[in-house]
Amino acid sequence: MADLNTIVDQLSGLTVMEAADLVKKLEEKWGVSAAAPVMVAGGAGGAAAAAPVEEKTEFNVVLADAGANKINVIKEVRAITGLGLKEAKDLVEGAPKEVKVGIPKAEADELKKKLEAAGAKVEIK
């Protein structure tokens, strides 16, 4: 068991480049590929399809189009993001752009309502 601890200590001291080189040498010596396990796991599609789908917890609010009332949309984007006037204007005029990223569903729905009330077309992804 002491030998394994020594090996672990030595491997922990490797740089990223040294670790990559070690992987290549082991692949050559043993005649395997690091990508092989991925292909084996991909072949079990039936079991993977039966697994429950994870519910998405983080959403992105995307401004699809500013609409006809750009000034109100710019004001709302500034209020939501805290951006300056120029940055908010650039974001609105550069649509489609992400307004907020990685937020909960409830907050994303609230921001969508606010932006749509200002005249924008909004998507939640």
UniProtKB/Swiss-Prot annotation:
Q: Per the UniProt entry, what are the Gene Ontology biological process annotations, in alphabetical order?
A: translation
Q: Short name of one Pfam family for this protein?
A: Ribosomal_L12
Q: Which UniProt keywords apply?
A: Ribonucleoprotein, Ribosomal protein
Any GO molecular function:
mRNA binding
Alphabetized Gene3D superfamilies for the sequence: 3.30.1390.10, Single helix bin
Question: Can you list the GO cellular component terms from the UniProt entry?
Answer: cytosolic large ribosomal subunit
Query: What does the subunit section of this Swiss-Prot or TrEMBL entry state?
Result: Homodimer. Part of the ribosomal stalk of the 50S ribosomal subunit. Forms a multimeric L10(L12)X complex, where L10 forms an elongated spine to which 2 to 4 L12 dimers bind in a sequential fashion. Binds GTP-bound translation factors.
Matching InterPro entries, A to Z? Ribosomal_bL12, Ribosomal_bL12_C, Ribosomal_bL12_C/ClpS-like, Ribosomal_bL12_oligo, Ribosomal_bL12_oligo_N_sf
Q: What does this protein do?
A: Forms part of the ribosomal stalk which helps the ribosome interact with GTP-bound translation factors. Is thus essential for accurate translation.
| Top-rank taxon | Bacteria
Listed name of the protein: Large ribosomal subunit protein bL12
Which PANTHER family does the record associate with it?
Answer: 39S RIBOSOMAL PROTEIN L12, LARGE RIBOSOMAL SUBUNIT PROTEIN BL12M
The record's comment on protein family reads: Belongs to the bacterial ribosomal protein bL12 family.
